[in-house]
Amino acid sequence: MARARKGALVQCDPSIKALILQIDAKMSDIVLEELDDTHLLVNPSKVEFVKHELNRLLSKNIYNPMDEEENQ
């Protein structure tokens, strides 16, 4: 029997999917279903939170050469 779930379909590359799953591991109510390598079904009320957390995580990993110049 098929089951229906309300969710937001997220399409992303595998590296972003891994980050979303990492966020979900801490909260455990974000990802409803892993569909394949590039698609997730996400709780619609958590989409903005996921975007915010992804931006925060990705901004920590950005190299900015201006930061080095300021520290010297």
UniProtKB/Swiss-Prot annotation:
Question: Can you list the GO cellular component terms from the UniProt entry?
Answer: cytosol; nucleus; transcription factor TFIIH core complex; transcription factor TFIIH holo complex
Q: This protein is called what?
A: General transcription and DNA repair factor IIH subunit TFB5
Give the similarity note. Belongs to the TFB5 family.
Q: Where are the transmembrane segments?
A: none
| UniProt cross-references to PANTHER family, sorted A to Z | GENERAL TRANSCRIPTION FACTOR IIH SUBUNIT 5 (PTHR28580:SF1)
Q: Where does the record place it?
A: Nucleus
| Disulphide connectivity of cysteines | none
Q: Name one GO biological process term.
A: nucleotide-excision repair, preincision complex assembly
Q: What is its main location?
A: nucleus
Tell me the superkingdom of the source: Eukaryota
Q: How does it assemble?
A: Component of the 7-subunit TFIIH core complex composed of XPB/SSL2, XPD/RAD3, SSL1, TFB1, TFB2, TFB4 and TFB5, which is active in NER. The core complex associates with the 3-subunit CTD-kinase module TFIIK composed of CCL1, KIN28 and TFB3 to form the 10-subunit holoenzyme (holo-TFIIH) active in transcription. An additionnal subunit, TFB6, plays a role in the dissociation of the SSL2 helicase from TFIIH after transcription initiation. Interacts with TFB2.
Q: What does this protein do?
A: Component of the general transcription and DNA repair factor IIH (TFIIH) core complex, which is involved in general and transcription-coupled nucleotide excision repair (NER) of damaged DNA and, when complexed to TFIIK, in RNA transcription by RNA polymerase II. In NER, TFIIH acts by opening DNA around the lesion to allow the excision of the damaged oligonucleotide and its replacement by a new DNA fragment. In transcription, TFIIH has an essential role in transcription initiation.
- Write one Pfam family the protein is assigned to: Tfb5
Q: Which UniProt keywords apply?
A: DNA damage, DNA repair, Nucleus, Transcription, Transcription regulation
Could you tell me which species this protein originates from?
Saccharomyces cerevisiae (strain ATCC 204508 / S288c)
